[in-house]
Amino acid sequence: MVIKVFLASSSSFVTIKKRQQEVLQFLEANRIEYEEVDITMLEEMRQWMYKNIPKDRLPGQGNPLPPQIFNDNAYCGDYESFFESKESNTVFLFLQLKARPAQKEL
């Protein structure tokens, strides 16, 4: 299972760039395997992302903004959901992954 982070490499919004960076840094720091999917370069992936976000999770207006997070083809959530799971220490549950036991640094 690979976490897919749908992002926009050419976004002019600083907030979106910071949120994307925060998600990727968290995944790297926790050694969670992930794949970046750039929706600005691949129209078919943008359409796939829109189609696979559950209707009840779509914004009231407009299109869903990146980053959007999937575990393979299963939708996990957007940045706000990711942030909430980070704050409540439930990120592995949010990402639909088994929690890893804490490892002691040598």
UniProtKB/Swiss-Prot annotation:
Keyword Transmembrane annotated: no
Family: Belongs to the SH3BGR family.
Location of this chain's protein in the cell: Nucleus
Protein name, entry field: SH3 domain-binding glutamic acid-rich-like protein 2-A
Main location: nucleus
Keywords of the record: Nucleus, SH3-binding
Classification via Gene3D superfamilies: Glutaredoxin (3.40.30.10)
Signal sequence coordinates: none
Pfam families hit by this protein: SH3BGR
MF-aspect GO terms: SH3 domain binding
Protein's organism: Xenopus laevis
Gene Ontology CC entries for this record: cytoplasm; nucleus
Residue numbers covered by motif SH3-binding: 61-67
